[in-house]
A protein has these predicted regions:
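Single conserved hydrophobic/aromatic residue that forms the stacking wall/gate
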Residues: 1-6, 10-13
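Hydrophobic alpha-helical segments of polytopic membrane proteins
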Residues: 14-86, 165-166, 173, 181
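Transmembrane helix irregularities
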Residues: 34-42, 145-148, 187-188
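Membrane-interface catalytic loops of GT-C/OST-like multi-pass glycosylation enzymes that act
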Residues: 40-44, 136, 189-200
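Juxtamembrane "helix-exit" motif on the non-cytosolic side of transmembrane helices
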Residues: 87-91
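Long extracytoplasmic/lumenal interhelical loops at the membrane interface
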Residues: 93-148
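A conserved mid-to-late transmembrane alpha helix and its immediate loop/hinge
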Residues: 133-165, 184
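Transmembrane alpha-helices of multi-pass inner-membrane enzymes
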Residues: 178-183, 194-219
Length: 219
């Protein structure tokens, strides 16, 4: 829990100070991140940390709005990757085996659930789902799919995608950078669906109240 809170605080810090971020900021925070990695050996945290900086650099260097549209692809790519590896994992396949190893066995666990229980269109109760327990589903995309069903998962991701498209049209790139960072986190952790841990989920509110956000952005 401490690690997750720390990671979320780092993401929020970069968001609130986005316009001030520079090479010195990147260098100092990267050094701190590497020190923490040596102490905790947490690959997830350090991977997401540097991925965030890559997206920040991309946003600050690239000026073309068309090229920046790739930021909208982060959640769809994360969802597609998670679903593909869950459905087609094979321990005898060198690449899939390596991916599973890099994510500490998460793919194997999800594939085991899929083979044992399959996927459902509608939500399932915990009693049904935990009839056979194979481990923690540490992947936000597949957690919502297994628990809530395909229909709810599709609706959820469509809402997020529409939110990202709205942010893109408004040129809210720093918000897209943070969502992109959490999109990778979603492949490796399940907390991303928690609104208390991931405040960027609240951005979906612009679909209901677009005028307020657009007015603030124009100012």
């Amino acid at each position: 829990t401490t690690r997750l809170v720390g990671s979320e605080m780092c993401i929020r810090d970069r968001y609130y100070n986005y316009e001030k971020l520079n090479v010195l900021w990147c260098g100092v925070t990267s050094l701190i991140a590497l020190v923490f990695y040596k102490m905790t050996f947490c690959r997830t945290g350090v991977l997401v940390f540097f991925f965030c900086w890559v997206l920040i650099l991309f946003d600050k260097v690239v000026k073309s709005k068309n090229i920046k549209s790739v930021l909208v692809c982060s959640v769809p790519v994360g969802a597609a990757f998670s679903l593909f590896t869950t459905l087609f994992y094979n321990g005898n396949h060198a690449l899939l085996y390596k991916i599973n190893h890099l994510v500490s066995g998460r793919v194997y666990i999800m594939n085991t659930y899929y083979k044992d229980q399959g996927l459902s269109l509608f939500p399932r109760t915990q009693e049904i789902f935990y009839t056979s327990y194979h481990g923690l589903i540490d992947n936000s995309y597949m957690q919502v799919t297994f628990y809530a069903g395909i229909l709810v998962a599709v609706l959820f991701f469509v809402i997020i995608l529409k939110t990202m498209l709205r942010l893109y049209r408004m040129e809210c790139y720093k918000e897209l950078v943070m969502i992109g960072t959490l999109a990778l986190y979603g492949v490796l952790e399940q907390f991303v669906l928690n609104g208390f841990m991931n405040i960027f989920l609240l951005l979906c509110g612009i679909l209901l109240y677009p005028g307020i956000v657009e007015e603030k952005h124009e100012k």
